[in-house]
Curated annotation (Swiss-Prot):
The lineage of its organism: Eukaryota, Metazoa, Spiralia, Lophotrochozoa, Platyhelminthes. This is Tetraspanning orphan receptor. Cell surface receptor that binds to human complement C2a protein. This results in inhibition of the classical and lectin pathways of complement activation, probably due to interference with binding of C2a to C4b and interference with cleavage by C1 or MASP2 such that C3 convertase cannot be formed. This infers resistance to complement-mediated cell lysis, allowing parasite survival and infection. Phosphorylated on tyrosine residues. Interacts (via N-terminal extracellular domain) with human C2a. InterPro entries: LAPTM_transporter. Residues 303-316 have a biased composition (Low complexity). The gene is TOR. It is found in: Cell membrane. Potential vaccine candidate molecule. Induces an immune response in mice and confers protection against S.mansoni infection. The chain crosses the membrane at residues 29-49, 166-186, 194-214, 241-261. It is a multi-pass membrane protein.
Length: 419
């Protein structure tokens, strides 16, 4: 087990980790395959309800006894919540059935788009202040007459008509986007993850709005639980706590999956830029992270930017040089030994080498050329010195000869003058 301080660092091993020990790419693929299976099962149920309308839970054709239909309604609502955005879009686009009539044969209005409910406005006894007694069949005649009086004789039953066609369309699009996500995670194409990611963002926002709406209308929802024909005693505080706990757990799970898909998108983008070593860490199965890793989900929310390739905490795909080993034989020579070496013992390095493999040959050729040039320069200097010496000796000889001739010529003139 790794220590807790090691999990707080920006190590690349824990940077893209989810579900305690899985890589974000593996978790995204598993999540996408699970969503595909759930959506295929849901589409199968929708096709069955399309060809067999008796399976539709809300279509009770005016029957006010909601004991059996409400059970199926809440079961299907739970299944709707497993598929992103299906339940929310379906609730906003469905209308009551045009031919639906109530018990007295009065036709329902199309403007009502709320769930099946009856307005029971009766006083709760003092003994049931914290308990809500829901018993429709065993109501006293006075309460029934009082309820009918408040309904002003309309006896209008608001029934929501289920439309499987809208749900099939929404689920098909969600299934296609989920297939894109799995394909993008497998083939390392990050742009294929964005459509399903946007659906997840939309579903998370709608789920949060539903939770806030439930918190503001808890007292109205207590009267909607009609799962049995007999009386049901429900604690209002306990019922509110259970519903809020389940809703918060679903919201946290959706937020976790949303962050996992986003981390997979960032990982694929970095992998495309070439800033990661490899896809699957070889030692990711060699340890199990602590509970802190579950809370942080391997996400790095620090101040450093992940997209910056110059960060020292990021892994790199460039080939790493071999570590330099200390060898006394290859160490630098002493200063006295350097002074004993002649100045032209080594040729200067070449200015440019286009061929990396031929650096040694080019250096040797340059050294030979330089030595040859130095020899030629020395020979030219010797020749020049010899020529200079010869010329100087010739000039001195000619000067001596001219002096002798001058002396010979001046001798007769001196003799003539003496005479």
């Amino acid at each position: 087990m790794p220590r807790a301080p090691a999990l707080l660092t920006n190590d690349a091993r824990h940077q893209f980790t989810c579900c305690l020990c899985l890589h974000v790419r593996t978790g995204t693929i598993i999540f996408g395959i699970t969503q595909i299976i759930i959506q295929l099962v849901f589409i199968s149920f929708l096709f069955l309800m399309t060809f067999n309308p008796r399976l539709i839970p809300e279509d009770n054709h005016g029957n006010t006894d909601p004991s059996e239909d409400k059970i199926r309604f809440y079961v299907f609502s739970t299944l709707f919540r497993l598929v992103p955005a299906v339940s929310d879009i379906h609730e906003s686009l469905t209308l009551p059935s045009p031919g639906t009539r109530n018990v007295n044969g009065n036709k329902l209005y199309l403007g009502h788009n709320v769930e099946s409910e009856t307005n029971f406005n009766y006083d709760i006894p003092p003994g049931y202040k914290d308990d809500v007694l829901v018993d429709v069949n065993n109501m006293s005649p006075s309460l029934v007459s009082y309820t009918q009086k408040n309904e002003r004789g309309s006896h209008e039953v608001k029934i929501k008509h289920f439309s499987p066609y809208i749900a099939v369309c929404v689920t098909t699009f969600s299934l296609a986007f989920c297939c894109f996500m799995v394909h993008g995670a497998i083939t390392k194409q990050p742009t294929h993850l964005l459509p399903f990611f946007f659906i997840q963002v939309f579903d998370l926002i709608i789920c949060l709005i539903h939770i806030l709406g439930f918190m503001s209308s808890t007292s109205d929802l207590r009267l909607m639980i009609h799962t049995k024909t007999g009386p049901i005693y429900i604690k209002s505080t306990g019922f509110t706590f259970i519903i809020l706990s389940i809703s918060c757990m679903m919201l946290a799970f959706k937020a976790y999956c949303l962050g996992m898909v986003w981390d997979c998108y960032k990982y694929l983008m970095l992998n495309r830029r070439g800033n990661l070593l490899d896809d699957w860490y070889s030692d990711q199965w060699g340890h199990l992270s602590t509970f802190w890793s579950l809370l942080r989900a391997g996400r790095n929310r620090g101040n450093n930017s992940i997209g910056n390739s110059g960060s020292p905490n990021e892994p790199n795909t460039r080939p790493r040089p071999e570590p330099i080993t200390y060898d006394p034989a290859n160490d630098l020579p002493k200063y006295e030994d350097i002074l004993k070496i002649p100045a032209n013992a080594y040729a200067p390095p070449p200015y440019y080498c286009s061929n990396i493999n031929g650096n040694v040959n080019t250096t040797e050729a340059s050294a030979v050329t330089t030595n040859t040039s130095n020899s030629a320069t020395a020979a030219n200097t010797t020749t020049t010195t010899t020529n200079t010496g010869t010329t100087t000796s010739v000039i001195s000889t000619l000067t001596t000869t001219n002096k002798d001739d001058t002396q010979i010529n001046s001798a007769p003139s001196n003799a003539h003058s003496s005479c």
